[in-house]
Amino acid sequence: MRGLIWNCRGAGKKGMATCLSALISDHSLDFVGLHKKFSPKCIRRIDPFGLFHWEWIPSAGKSGGILSGVRHDIFYVISCNKGKYILQMVVHDKKIKKDWGLLVVYGSTHEEFKEEFLVELAAMCSNMSVPYIVGGDFNILRNCNEKNKMMNSSRSTDIFNSIINALALREIYTSGGKYIWTNNQAHPTLEKLDRILMSEDWENLFPMVYVRKLVQELSDHNPLLLSSGE
C-alpha cells in the first residue's frame, strides 16, 4: 500500500493537476491527502478515469481546503467526518480485510487559531475506534530541531506534544531530509511542518511502514510518500 500526503500550494497552477496525476501513476498510489483549493474540474484532471473515491473540505478564503481520495478497488469507504481542519475517513481495507482510519489535517497558519485546531485534533483522534493514521500540514513545530533558525517557545508546541503523548501516537520517521517546507528566499527558512502520525494498533497492522520525502515540485512543501513496506 502506498499513499501521498502533500500541501500542494497553488493547486490551480498550470501543470499542478498533471503533476498530481503523474504522482498517482508513478508511485501506484492507493490513497492521497492534499491541501489547498480544488475544483471539480481539477479533480477530473487528477483522476480522469474515476479510480478514486474523493471527499473534500472547501477552502475558506486564501486558506484551508483538504482533498482526500482512496482507490475504489483497494478500499471501501465506511464513513466520512469533516471538521474545520480535519477530514476523517474510515475505510475497509479489502486486502487485509480490516477497517482503519485516514485523517488528513491542515492546521491553521495563524497562532490565534492553533488551539482551536488542536482541540479538533484531540477530539477526532480520541473518538477513533479503529486503527488510524493522521497526517498533513500541522503548521506546528514539535521542537527547535525542526527549524533551521532560532525558534521561540510556543504554547501550541507544548499542547501538540501533549496530545501526541496522551493518545500514544508515534511519528513515522521521514527519510530524505529533515525539513519539509521552505520560504524559497535567498537565505531560506526551513521547517518541518508536515508529518504522519500513527496509532499503536495501526502500526501493528503495518509494522514495516515508512515515509519518504519526495522532490519539491510546484509547491513550497515536499510531498510525503508513505509505504506499508510490503
Predicted regions and their residues:
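A shared catalytic/ligand-binding motif for oxyanion handling
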Residues: M1-E230
